[in-house]
Amino acid sequence: LRFVDASVFVYAFLKPRRGLAPRESEVKERAKGIVKRINEGERVGMTVAQLVEVANLLERYMGEAAYQVEHFLLHAPNVAVYPVDWAVCAEALRVAKERRVGLADAIAYVVMTRQGVREIYSFDSDFDKLEGVRRVTE
């Protein structure tokens, strides 16, 4: 099981308003490949914080089509959505301040470490600042 970050869905689903640079096109294709594998049954996890992050971004740019993605993430048997409580948030805030990462990324990190998960699909280099986690980009 790997965790999956909101950045994967952003790159996979959002349509750019301008032409993409070659590096951006490559990242978009890799993100689509990750999403395809998840759709085909690869087991992944995320916290409710990442789910809300995905929802906010996709709803803003995709409108009602975003609900299909959200429904899949909530109901697919191969996607584990982990709860977040006050204790997770408090620990994550400490991590975020110490490592200079966003709170949502720190929440994912705290839950991952508690669950024994060591890899995350992500295009966010902030995960490289977090010990014991390997960022996977394809």
Predicted regions: what is each one?
Residues 9, 50, 88, 108, ...:
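Alpha-helix capping/helix-boundary segments
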Residues 52-55, 93:
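Amphipathic alpha-helical segments within well-ordered protein domains
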Residues 2-5, 46-48, 101-102, 124, ...:
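Histidine- and aromatic-rich ligand-binding microenvironments
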Residues 78-119:
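Active-site neighborhoods of divalent-metal-dependent phosphate/nucleic-acid chemistry enzymes
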Residues 40-41, 76-77, 98, 130:
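Structured helix-beta-strand junction loops
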Residues 37-38, 73, 95:
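Hydrophobic helix-cap positions at the C-terminus of alpha-helices
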Residues 1, 109-138:
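Acidic, PIN/NYN-like endoribonuclease modules and their adjacent C-terminal/linker elements
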Residues 1-46, 60-68:
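Short, well-structured N-terminal submotif of metal-dependent ribonuclease cores
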